[in-house]
Amino acid sequence: MRLLAAALLLLLLALCASRVDGSKCKCSRKGPKIRYSDVKKLEMKPKYPHCEEKMVIVTTKSMSRYRGQEHCLHPKLQSTKRFIKWYNAWNEKRRVYEE
């Protein structure tokens, strides 16, 4: 009986630990250096209950050196703020030439 109770307790602890890992913010570290021309999509996701800041997710083109990977950039870093500012300006300029 004690063995069964111990096994259930360990199972409960394992479930709680897996939920804690899944509730962390994705953007905790600085991402790789990405060029504006390599970006396919830039997403800014709002704050979630488990994450205190917004998430900035960059999807690269399949022909770039990162080959279509998604990278999460830390929103509070100055480099990320500059990247968003300059990417939006670059994207607007590119749109004018495409139309």
From Swiss-Prot:
GO MF term list: chemokine activity
Please describe the organ and tissue distribution of this protein's expression. Answer: Highly expressed in brain, lung, ovary, muscle and in kidney and liver parenchyma, and at lower levels in bone marrow.
Keywords assigned: Cytokine, Disulfide bond, Secreted, Signal, Ubl conjugation
Q: Where is this motif: D-box?
A: 55-69
Q: How is it modified after translation?
A: Ubiquitinated, followed by degradation by the proteasome.
One GO cellular component term of this record is: extracellular space
Which cell locations does it reside in?
A: Secreted
Q: Which domain of life is it from?
A: Eukaryota
Question: Where in this chain does the entry annotate a coiled-coil region?
Answer: none
List, in alphabetical order, the GO biological process terms annotated in this UniProt record: immune response; inner ear development; negative regulation of myoblast differentiation; positive regulation of natural killer cell chemotaxis
Q: Which InterPro entries match?
A: Chemokine_IL8-like_dom, Interleukin_8-like_sf
Residues annotated as signal peptide = 1-22
Q: Which cysteines are joined by disulfide bonds?
A: 25-51, 27-72
| Chief location bin | secreted
Q: What does this protein do?
A: Chemotactic for CESS B-cells and THP-1 monocytes, but not T-cells.
Family affiliation: Belongs to the intercrine alpha (chemokine CxC) family.
What does the entry note on its domains? The destruction box (D-box) acts as a recognition signal for degradation via the ubiquitin-proteasome pathway.
Q: What is this protein called?
A: C-X-C motif chemokine 14
